[in-house]
Design a protein with these regions (language model features):
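Anionic-ligand binding patches
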Residues: 1-4, 37-184
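N-terminal beta1-alpha1 ligand-phosphate binding loop
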Residues: 1-21
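Cofactor-binding loop segments of dinucleotide-utilizing enzymes, especially the Rossmann-like FAD-
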Residues: 8, 28, 107
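Short loop/helix-cap segments at secondary-structure boundaries that form the rim of catalytic
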Residues: 14-18, 35, 55-57
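Short glycine-rich, Thr/Ser-proximal phosphate-binding strand/loop in the N-terminal lobe
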Residues: 20-37, 110-115
Length: 184
């Protein structure tokens, strides 16, 4: 039985590696679709399921998707640097929620769930936003910031697990994996 991470995210791979898992990385070819409204948790789970649906045989495939939720609006990955800066302006001085959906495919079945973490960012100055966006770091991250990177200095409060914000809630993953692959 082989564990496969259906993601090109180096952050998800790093979390799995640090938790002691042996796995292959095979980014999913699943198309992401815009948030249709409704429950952000259901949306992240549906995207994670689409990513995990690929694979077969004796593989256990893990898919995940993360969004930032502010005042009921879902912030995915920014389209460009201007979009990333706009997201950071909206999040500045505010508390928001990060939702990560995880799905595991094994033996033709898909199990999924989600985890939520609340974060508060301090008020950000315009020059800080510009300098951070200029690093390029926020361009591939939901909400336009990387908690595990340069944006860590913006966070004043974290309620929940950091790995949910980084993109792979390990406690949830452990529950979803077949027993023979679970790590303590």
């Amino acid at each position: 039985m082989r564990l496969v991470l259906a993601s090109s995210s180096p952050r998800r791979a790093s979390l799995l590696r640090a938790a002691g898992y042996d796995f292959d990385v095979r980014p999913s070819g699943a198309e992401e679709w815009p948030f249709p409204g409704g429950d952000p948790a259901g949306y992240t789970e549906a995207l994670a399921q689409a990513k995990a649906a690929e694979g077969g045989g004796d593989e256990v495939v893990v898919g995940a998707d993360t969004v930032v939720v502010l005042d009921g609006s879902v912030l995915g990955k920014p389209a460009d640097a201007a979009d990333a800066a706009a997201m950071l302006r909206r999040l500045s001085g505010r508390t928001h929620e990060v939702v990560t959906g995880v799905a595991v495919r094994h033996d033709g079945e898909i199990r999924s769930g989600h985890a939520r973490t609340r974060l508060t960012l301090r008020v950000l100055e315009e020059d800080e936003i510009s300098a951070y966006v200029d690093t390029g770091e926020p361009l591939d991250k939901a909400g336009g910031y990387g908690y595990q990177g340069g944006a860590a200095r913006f966070v004043t409060r974290l309620e929940g697990d950091a790995d949910t914000v980084i993109g792979l809630p390990l406690a949830l993953l452990r529950e979803l994996l077949p027993p023979e692959l679970r790590r303590a």
